[in-house]
Each structure stands twice: as C-alpha cells, then as structure tokens.
Amino acid sequence: MQRSVQKLIVWLGAIFVAYHIFSLLFAGRASRNGYSKGISLQSPAKLKGDPQRAAAIVEAFRFSWDKYEQFAAPHDTLLPISKTYEDDRNGWGATAVDGLSTAIIMEDAEIVDKILRQIMLTDFTVTVVPDQPISLFETTIRYLGGLLSAYDLLSGSYKHLATDMYLRNNLLKAAIILADRLSIAFDTPSGIPDDEIIFNPQLRRFGNIDNSITCFGTLVLEWTRLSDLTGNQTYAKLAQRAQDHLIHPKTKQSFTLPGLIGTYVKLKDGYFGDYQAGWGGGSDSYYEYLIKMYAYDPVAFAEYGESWIKAAESSMLYLASSPSTRPDLTFLGEMRGNTMIPISSHLASVCGGSLILGGLLLQNQTFVDFGVKLSESYYDVYRQSPSGIGPELFRWVDDGRQPLAKASSKRLPAPKWQSFYEKSGYYHTNAEYILRPETIESLYYAYRATGDRKYQDWAWEAFEALNRMCKVEGGYTGLKSVMKTKDDKTRKFVDKMESFWLAETLKYLYLMFAEDSELQVRSDGKMKYVLNTEAHPLLVRGK
C-alpha cells in the first residue's frame, strides 16, 4: 500500500513539475518586479564590471578589517557593538584566515601580508580553550579552505602579492598540520566522521553518534585539493570514503525521493534516521558540493554530478512551491516524511546559485532558468522586508499546486503579519540576520549566467541595505530583526561580525562588480577555479 501511495505521489509530482516548468519557460505568466523568463545562456564574452561600486565594496572590506584589527586581532571574531572579541572558532584567528582570499582578490597587499604573518604565529595543534570541541565542518571550510585557497592564489594568478615565499609556503604547511590533527574524526566504524574533535589536552573524538550530511558531505573538495597539492592521497581517501555513504545512501525508511537523501546519518553503520530532506541547514552544502566536485574534475567525479542531477530534478519536482498570495514566486520547501513543509531559510537561498552553476557546467538551460527563478524569488524576500534584508527563517502557505504540500502543513501567519503576507508571500519565523551571503551569492550566479545588469543593481540595493542597517562604529553587526527599520528605536543587534562576512558576503559583492577575470564564473562552464562553500577559490584539477 505504501509503495502504491508513493508511486501516486511521484506521478502527481511529475505532472506538477511539467506544468510548473512549462509555465516558467514558455507561458510568460505576468510577474512583478521584472522577473526573467526563458533566459538564454550568455556567450563567454567578458561581462562589464562597475569600478565605482567595486571600490565601495573594497572600502567596506577594509573598514571591517580595520575594526577587527583594532578590537579583535589575533582572535577569532569581532564583537562590533561591545568592541571586543571572542574565540568561538578554536582561537586561530578565524576572521583573518577566512578573509585572506578576499584580501588577495582585492589585491590589498598590506592586509595580505598582515594575515600571512598572523598565520605564521598560529599554533593549529591546540585550541585556546582546553577541551573546546572543534567542528570538523567549520574548521574545514573556513580554515583548511582558506589556507589552501590562499596558497593556490598566491602560487598562480596573484603570485605578485607573495613577496615572501616562506610565508606563502607556510599556508600549505599549516593546512597539512591541521588536517593531520583533524583526521582522527574519521576513526569510526563506518568512516563517517564525528563532527567534533578535542585537540587538547588530549587528542580525541568528542563521541557523537550521528552527523549531518552538511557536516560530513562538505569536506571532500578541500580534502581532495590537499591531496592533490601534497601527493598524499590519505586526505582524499578519508573524505571520499565518507562521501560514498551519501552517494550510495542506506535507509530503512519506506519513503524517500530520488537524489534527496535524509539529513542525519549514524556513525556506527551509515544508516539514515528519519526522512528529512531539503536545502536548509544540515543539508544545503552537501548538494552544493556534488556539482562543485564535478566542476573540480568532471571525469573522476562524474557520479557526483549524476547525484546532483537527481537532487536538482527532485527539488524542482517535489520541493518547489509558490505562496498562495504570490504565485509569481517560487521557493524550495523541506521534506518531513512524505510531506513537503512550506518553510525555507536564508541558507536555502543558495539553491538558486547551485542550479545555475549546474546548468552552466552541464549546459542545461532548464536548470539555469529554474535557478534564476529561485534566485529572483529569494531576493524578493529582501525587497519586501522593511529593512531591505531577508530573515533567517520564513514560511508561506502553498498555493495548491505542489502535491506533497498536504493540508496538515498549512499554517497561516499570525494576524499581525497577515497584511504583510498578502503583499510579500512569506512571513518570518526567525527574523534574525547574521551577515549571511547566500541570497547575494545566487544573484552573482544569475548575473554571470545571463549578463543581465539588473542583478548588479539588486546586489547594490542589498549592499546599501547592509550599510544602512548593519554598519556601526565598531564594524558590521547582525540584526535581531530584519522587520525593523533603522529609525525603529526598539531595534536590536546580534553582536557579532561573522568571519563569513569577509570571506563570502563581501567577496560575492566584489565579484559582482569586479572586472572579468579567470576567477569569475563563466557561462560556458569552463572555470579555472571552483569556490568552496565559504567562497574560497580552489584551483580546478589540471588547470
């Protein structure tokens, strides 16, 4: 009986996506805000930069760095309201390491030199706080990715900034030292790593019983790159063995969707727990890395590309949903069992960029068009917000076209937000903003795919909102609620300048307005670099 129901749902979903894609690509349904329809891939001719806007982004980066240097260096994270710091990322100077590749791309030789010298003085074998759990995921994407990216850039396109070869070579040395210590995380019965490790006083795993697909499915790019740079295949083998559990998932659940695997996996045997799937926290960057590994080496990682295609197609079939009050918008919901819940997040807005990137690599127009549609819809969340910035989490009521959105998942907004929902098509469930990049990131991919300068204008709108709402005397800070304007005297801040503000948000803004270069995404899919989930460019294998 369950199989029959599942087949029926899949069949209904196929009808839905056929209608949805047809209306998106061909029907020309009237839309607000000038949304694109039937977008054509641009030739790989150079796209125009905007020097004045690019300079403004550089100024924001330097302001952020100056405040970090003044109040927080060499510690991890600046607290811009209280003008102090915290060591929330192991005490190794997360903001500096994470911001290094951006400083290199902006060709700020002074900041690059300062960070290289700070890294030289950093001991990556101990944490500042004893018994502090280290996140394998966060340490890989921020530190390992940052070190390897800087090494790649300073060894190639930006070698003129590497005035001291000893400092440059120390980047790879530090990455090796760090990865060797982190490797204990993979010492589990299944080879799926524990996401938490203790470095000191004794090196050991923390002892978690499961891990999310984001936390261990977003390691393979950095660990494979480290193997390619060193010739030591141990690092790649560890990460790829873990990844195999996701490429060939094991589950006891009666209902799953093709390509959209669950979220949590047992370290003991590699089996998935309850079926939860989507592009939100816990899942997002696993899907992102499938297509990025294909970009890194389309032959060696062809199976990763095939897995991404399945996930992308299922996302279009079973997760795509339009709000009841804004049928012109399309978001991706989350699966809970056999029901699609119409909820999404700032993290999930990366889905548009991933579909565009996959479409460019595969030269598949349908993926590009759907990715652009998602990117535009998620940016509309920004435009409708009183602050001009999108919230951490939001929800909507499905318009009835998604078969997996059952009546039980329908939840109306609170009365005070009903009029806002009528206009915007969403209502927030967590109104915070912590300087995240994903919506701007997807606009960047939309611009690189289409050459349409409206995406530059939208990114500039977002930057103006960030300057207006988040810039304070001590740096850039998060917001407790994007539903409050600058003039609202009750507005409050999240007192933290996350390292990804320098690594990702400002980098994507800069790349949006920078002149064409070999770092930029190309519409023909022939890229020299692939950006990790922290926006650190890594040299594609064989380039």
Language-model-derived ranges and their functions:
Residues Q2-K543:
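Glycan-recognition and catalytic cores of secretory/periplasmic carbohydrate-active enzymes
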